[in-house]
């Protein structure tokens, strides 16, 4: 569960390394984001020469959470870290590569480009 002020690792090569959540999109009083949800965040750490800079406000989709997600068959998928991928307004990733595994739930949320770029889909 990602909420306001949560810090996430960035799982792409857009130039950002860490994000701070500003808002969870979807509904007026929504508090938590899970895998596949879109957040508004600011870049807290960035690598030199990247597409995004420190202080930029970006949209991102959550691809890994420590709290995990429940599947329809009753199983759970859980990761070691909270991570997100920075996206454009048309839901395509800003970077050209995705690092680390992503959850299968992204396929249900129509993030097919992220799923196809990911090295592993769990």
Curated annotation (Swiss-Prot):
What is the annotated quaternary arrangement, including any partners? Answer: Part of the 50S ribosomal subunit. Forms a cluster with proteins L3 and L19. In the 70S ribosome, L14 and L19 interact and together make contacts with the 16S rRNA in bridges B5 and B8.
GO BP field: translation
Q: Which SUPFAM superfamilies match?
A: Ribosomal protein L14 (SSF50193)
What is the protein named?
A: Large ribosomal subunit protein uL14
Supply the InterPro entries for this chain.
Ribosomal_uL14, Ribosomal_uL14_bac-type, Ribosomal_uL14_CS, Ribosomal_uL14_sf
The cross-references to PANTHER family, in alphabetical order and at most eight, read:
50S/60S RIBOSOMAL PROTEIN L14/L23, LARGE RIBOSOMAL SUBUNIT PROTEIN UL14M
- Read off the Gene3D superfamilies from this record: Ribosomal protein L14 (2.40.150.20)
> Pfam families, per this entry?
Ribosomal_L14
| GO molecular function (one) | large ribosomal subunit rRNA binding
Q: Which family does it belong to?
A: Belongs to the universal ribosomal protein uL14 family.
* GO cellular component terms attached to this protein's record: cytosolic large ribosomal subunit
Q: Which HAMAP family match?
A: Ribosomal_uL14
Q: What does the record give as the function of this protein? A: Binds to 23S rRNA. Forms part of two intersubunit bridges in the 70S ribosome.
Keywords, comma-separated and alphabetical: Ribonucleoprotein, Ribosomal protein, RNA-binding, rRNA-binding
Quick check: keyword Ribonucleoprotein in the entry? yes
